[in-house]
Amino acid sequence: MPRKVAVYPGSFDPITYGHLDIIDRGLRIFDEIIVAVARNSAKNSLFSIDERVDMIQRVLADNVRARVDTFDGLLVDYVLSQNATVIIRGLRAISDFEYEFQIAQMNRSISQDVETLFMMTSVPFGYLSSSIVKEVSSLNGPIDGLVPPLVREALKDKFSKPR
């Protein structure tokens, strides 16, 4: 029986417990999840691509069924190059759905072989985003329940340096 592989794309700047929840729940459905960090030069990221990959690899170190990679270009092309057939997207609210629906439709128009699976975030993470985490952290607010400890420390380091 062929392995069921899904790609979970994003900027993960930084990875949060909301992202990790989607990965954990996705692994109930798929044999492997590729956490695909987008090389998006249009986004102004706090962490470099290498820093983000390193953090995610360290957070997922004990999970042999999740691996981290980077991609640029069309997501559909990347998914097919990895012998995957599904893109996982987490949805927090209705406002996420409209944008994600349009992207899923575009991806489907490019390749009929790639499906998009929308997963609703678990209730405790319904409001959580990397942007909120960065904003709270930049103001020295508590982010303990939002990100893993190593991410919290990386954020603390970033915001303690003059910018």
UniProtKB/Swiss-Prot annotation:
Q: What class of enzyme is it?
A: transferase
The signal peptide stretch is: none
Q: Extract the InterPro entries matched here.
A: Cyt_trans-like, PPAT, Rossmann-like_a/b/a_fold
- What does the record give under GO molecular function? ATP binding; pantetheine-phosphate adenylyltransferase activity
* Gene3D superfamilies cross-referenced by the UniProt entry: HUPs
Q: Name one Pfam family in it.
A: CTP_transf_like
> What pathway is this protein said to act in by its record?
Cofactor biosynthesis; coenzyme A biosynthesis; CoA from (R)-pantothenate: step 4/5
Q: What is its EC number?
A: 2.7.7.3
- Hydrolase is among the record's keywords: no
Record-marked site positions (Transition state stabilizer):
19
Q: Which GO terms describe its biological process?
A: coenzyme A biosynthetic process
Q: Does the keyword Transferase apply?
A: yes
Q: Which UniProt keywords are given for this protein, alphabetically ordered? A: ATP-binding, Coenzyme A biosynthesis, Cytoplasm, Magnesium, Nucleotide-binding, Nucleotidyltransferase, Transferase
> What positions belong to coiled-coil segments?
none
* Subunit structure comment from the entry: Homohexamer.
Q: What is this protein's function per UniProt?
A: Reversibly transfers an adenylyl group from ATP to 4'-phosphopantetheine, yielding dephospho-CoA (dPCoA) and pyrophosphate.
* NCBIfam families referenced in this protein's UniProt entry, alphabetically: coaD_prev_kdtB, cyt_tran_rel
Name of the protein in its database record: Phosphopantetheine adenylyltransferase
- Which species is the source of this protein? Geobacter metallireducens (strain ATCC 53774 / DSM 7210 / GS-15)
